[in-house]
Design a protein with these regions (language model features):
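Extended alpha-helical scaffold regions
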Residues: 1-562
Length: 562
């Protein structure tokens, strides 16, 4: 498991180091062709070939960027870009950046942002070549160098959704490149030489450097600390750069991005430490401004807790965000975001099924109903223990876990060497803890049927020896209590509390069982179903009003002739 800690000061300052052009195998650079008349003619022809609707979109996007019209930019980005992608570029890339340059007067900033969209679409719909992966990294370096290395704050303003997507896509492409690089047996000799000659491209240090630099430049950590103390964060801690929404939100989203990267590397303790100044109890926190960011925070927090064996905290995190998703699913207007949120929700249901099976606890009834519908059979099998339980936990983990990466490149001189898949390694880490925990649901299912029971009788039921049963009971006792987060900034801290409703005492060969029953919350059930009924009544009343207003208004009867 990757455990190296990166401190903020290690990544301070200029990040020009990550922006070096990579060495292409043919020895040429893009600048060699800038004055080529033939290429200029091709660019003009390519610009004319762009569909009229797309050219209008690019023109509006360019003008709104120049005028810092954030609301119109948000509409262009969140609605029009997706619709045009589906209409014209469902199975093709967007127009080449050099063709678009002719439409916007070679504006460098706009073209850098356009390339970010261009490569993002390529990653989502096509199979990017190694050359495209290198170019995309180079473009991100240009963008982040422009933002971080300016003498003063930029006047640039972008919608929060776009800023989040920039950070999120940057990390996704890093993960994708690491996976692509590790499969040397699928790479050609030329590609291997290109990878070997460019170790700085999508380097782990470079990616962490960018995220830490954005955090430092925005002073977002100081702003969050000041906000917890009740101070005016913007005035006291933001500084010249952090007062601008561009830097503030990029810095904040980079904190969430770091949580994701640390989980991908397998350092779950550092992932939770990264969020020490983020108040997850604040329903108006900055992470709630973008739904995808909100879901991402709780997904990785819950996953980190699960990998640390804190199943009660993981359950709490998953239930919180799944409840939010269930209650707001009708308000997601953007199809792309709706699909990604739903996909992540399905993964969290699988992880929640594992956590609740290993550490039985009560959850919100709405989430419990959905969980039972999706994974009732798997949960039942896990609670019985045995090899079948391990197999099911493995399947759920492979489906729902994030994509792990190996931070170091493979041995390019020996491509035939077998490399341990990081996904398999992290699965072993999870199962090592889960196998010890399996005794809890198995014993609980038998003990809850009795108030007292003879040790030999239970051993006969379980078909194990008395000594082995004593060992299992001691394991249950140890697993019965866990550290549980009690709120506050320290996600790693908490109180040692019981995590299940059943305890026991062993005296000689007699087991005395005590179960703490929690009364059913009937009020919640009535309130929820009353709200559903009210929504149904409102919907019917609206339809009735529309019908009366003219939709179903009867036509006047025609006069009959005598």
């Amino acid at each position: 498991m990757y455990q190296e800690n990166y401190e903020d000061e290690e990544f301070a300052g200029n990040i020009d180091v990550v922006a070096d052009s990579y060495v292409n195998s043919n020895g040429h650079d893009e600048g060699d062709y800038e004055d080529d008349e033939h290429l200029q003619q091709q660019a003009q022809a390519g610009a004319q070939a762009i569909p009229e609707q797309v050219r209008k979109f690019l023109g509006h996007l360019y003008r709104n960027l120049l005028s810092s019209n954030v609301s119109d930019l948000a509409y262009n980005y969140e609605n029009q870009f997706g619709r045009l992608s589906e209409k014209y570029y469902a199975k093709a890339s967007w127009p080449e950046p050099q063709f678009v340059a002719a439409l916007v007067g070679d504006d460098g900033l706009f073209l850098t942002l356009y390339r970010e969209l261009y490569y993002r679409h390529m990653y989502s719909q096509l199979h990017p070549t190694l050359e495209a992966r290198f170019r995309s990294f180079e473009n991100y370096c240009d963008l982040f160098n422009y933002i971080l290395n300016s003498d003063g704050p930029l006047e640039l303003e972008l919608p929060n959704q776009w800023l989040w997507d920039i950070v999120d896509e940057f990390i996704y492409q890093f993960q994708s490149f690491c996976t692509h690089r590790s499969w040397l047996n699928k790479r050609s000799a030329e590609e291997i030489e290109l990878l070997k000659a460019n170790p700085q491209v999508w380097n782990t240090y470079s990616v962490l450097n960018v995220l830490y630099s954005l955090i430092q430049k925005s002073s977002i950590t100081q702003q969050l600390v000041a906000a917890q103390d009740g101070a005016d964060a913007a005035a006291l801690a933001a500084g010249e750069f952090g007062a601008r929404p561009l830097y503030k939100m990029l810095g904040y989203f980079s904190i969430v991005g770091l949580v994701r990267v640390h989980c991908m590397l397998g350092d779950y303790t550092l992932a939770l430490q990264t969020l020490e100044n983020v108040d997850l109890n604040n329903s108006r926190g900055l992470f709630t401004r973008v739904t995808a960011c909100h879901v991402t925070v709780y997904y990785y927090v819950g996953f980190a807790y699960m990998m640390l064996g804190r199943y009660a905290d993981a359950t709490q995190a998953f239930v919180h965000i799944l409840t939010f998703v269930a209650r707001t699913k009708h308000y997601h207007q953007r199809a792309g975001q709706f699909d990604s949120v739903n996909k992540k929700a399905e993964q969290m249901y699988a992880l929640l099924a594992s956590c609740v099976s290993l550490c039985p606890t009560r959850v919100d009834e709405m989430v419990h109903s959905a969980l039972r519908e999706k994974y009732a059979d798997q949960q039942h099998k896990v609670q019985r223990g045995g090899d079948e339980a391990v197999e099911i936990l493995s399947e759920l983990f492979r489906f729902a876990s994030p994509k792990f990466i190996t931070p170091n490149p493979p041995n390019y001189d020996a491509p035939e060497e077998t490399v341990v898949e990081p996904q398999d390694f992290q699965l072993k880490v999870f199962l090592r803890e889960a196998k010890l925990q399996l005794v809890v649901p198995m014993l609980r299912s038998f003990l809850k049927l009795y108030t007292t029971m003879d040790l030999a009788q239970l051993a006969a039921v379980l078909d194990v020896g008395a000594d082995e049963l004593r060992t299992q009971l001691m394991v249950y006792k140890l697993r019965y209590r866990q550290v549980k987060w009690a709120g506050g900034a320290d996600l790693l801290g908490g109180e040692v509390v019981p995590t299940t409703d059943l305890d026991f005492a062993l005296q000689q060969d007699m087991i005395f069982i005590a179960e703490s029953r929690v009364g059913r919350r009937y009020a919640d059930w009535f309130i929820r179903n009353t709200n559903k009924m009210q929504d149904l009544i409102n919907s019917l009343e609206t339809r009735q009003k529309n019908f009366i207003a003219g939709v179903g208004k009867p036509e006047p009867a025609a006069e009959t002739k005598a």
